[in-house]
Regions:
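Functional-site microenvironments in short loops/helix caps that host divalent-cation chemistry
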Residues: 26-40, 63, 69, 74, ...
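Short, structured beta-strand segments at or near domain termini in extracellular proteins/domains
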Residues: 331-347
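Bacterial N-terminal signal peptides
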Residues: 1-6
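N-terminal pre-domain segments of enzymes
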Residues: 15-53
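A short glycine-rich, aromatic-capped structural motif
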Residues: 52-148, 162-170, 269
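Short, P/G- and charge-enriched loop/turn segments at secondary-structure junctions
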Residues: 48-50, 80-84, 321-326
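Short proline/glycine-enriched turn/loop segments at secondary-structure junctions
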Residues: 293-296, 322-329
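C-terminal motif of bacterial Sec signal peptides marking the signal peptidase cleavage site
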Residues: 9-10
Length: 349
């Protein structure tokens, strides 16, 4: 019986792949480098293709790998059944540093109406992909949302504000379009194909929101919603009937307030964010503890995280989880994208 060979890597050591001859010269070929096809003198040689280097796409930051205790940071008896704690590990990925803005999403719908109308149909694009601008009036009874309904998505005044009125399915379509746009460019310039853009899993979102701080109740790390000067640290509803105390009665610009330690803006408040996972009250026992995600195509409810401009502080907590039906569009739900980081992690090679 042949014993398996296990290659392990310790901190600060050279890559174990270096032992397999990657990047080295062929001693049998007179010192010449191994060909790109990995075959030399009738033998297959361990080598890597040159020219590949994954860097953070524009507007994204690298979220390192790590381990976190998912769930409520504080004891919450009422939520114990749906927010149980579990230790999980997350591999590195890239994440948008802000929520997807009106300006960014407008480029998507403009592209759809120009390039894809013959395939998808104008009715589908307008009913499914175009933001429901009437959500500002429909979400609240006896509320005058005419100004936001008429101008929020179309006016330059709101270009850098997070897009809302987007269903989970529309967010997924945006990710697919963004992936094609990026890889078409890379293909034209003979570059390697990039991993796809997608929605974050709940575990990825929670890990990123905490900014590397173990057990952080809020993205800024401490358990308070205001700083020492009494200024609120996010866009939410701090008092009964007072939406203006933080400076913004509705949404705020996507880069408002200070970022967390990973460089992410508005991971608490402003707009709640769609996640990839389906919602289940007690899904943690059935998911793995490495890169967990709960996919159930028969479950129409999808996880939203982060709380919004209309929510009280409880919904801003990193461990708080709630849901919305995938086809619903709200004035307080947006999204941001992530992308897998492939291969070794900078600083650990």
């Amino acid at each position: 019986m042949i014993a398996p060979i296990v290659i392990m890597q310790s901190c600060g050591s050279k890559s174990p792949l270096s032992k397999l001859g990657i990047g080295k010269k062929n001693s049998k070929g007179g010192g010449k480098e191994i060909g790109m096809d990995g075959v030399r003198d009738g033998e297959i040689i361990a080598t890597s293709r040159k020219g590949y280097k994954q860097t953070a796409p524009y507007g994204m930051v690298l979220i390192p790998s790590g381990s976190l205790m998912m769930g409520q940071a504080d004891e919450d008896v009422m939520s114990a059944r749906i927010s149980m704690n579990k230790r999980v590990t997350i591999v590195p990925f890239y994440m948008d540093d802000t929520e997807v803005t009106n300006h960014e999403y407008r480029q998507f719908v403009n592209s759809m109406t120009t390039d894809s109308v013959s395939v998808l149909g104008e009715e589908f694009i307008m009913s499914t992909l175009y933001p429901d601008t009437a959500v500002w009036s429909k979400d609240f009874t006896y509320h005058n949302g005419d100004q936001m309904t008429e101008y929020y998505f179309s006016s330059p005044a709101f270009d850098m504000y997070p897009v809302v009125g987007i269903s989970w399915d529309a967010a997924v379509y945006f990710c697919k379009w963004r992936t094609k746009l990026f890889n078409d460019f890379r293909s034209q310039h003979t570059m390697f194909k990039s991993p796809r853009y997608r929605l974050p899993s709940e575990a990825e979102w929670e890990w990123a929101a905490r900014g590397g701080k173990e057990g952080a109740k809020y993205p800024w790390g401490n358990p308070y919603v205001a700083n020492g000067k009494g200024c609120f640290l996010a866009n939410f509803k701090p008092y009964r009937g007072n939406y203006r105390a933080d400076g913004y009665p509705y949404t705020a610009p996507s880069n408002a307030f200070n970022p967390n330690d990973y460089g992410l803006y508005n991971m608490a408040g402003n707009v709640a964010e769609w996640c990839q996972d389906a919602y289940a009250e007690s899904y943690m026992p059935v998911t793995w503890d490495l890169n967990p995600v709960y996919n159930d195509e028969n479950e129409p409810r999808k996880i939203i995280k982060g709380g919004s401009w209309k929510d009280v502080a409880y919904f801003l907590e990193t461990g708080t989880r709630t849901y919305e039906f995938r086809n619903e569009r709200r004035s307080y739900i947006g999204f941001r994208c992530v992308m897998d980081r492939l291969g070794s992690v900078p600083g650990r090679e």
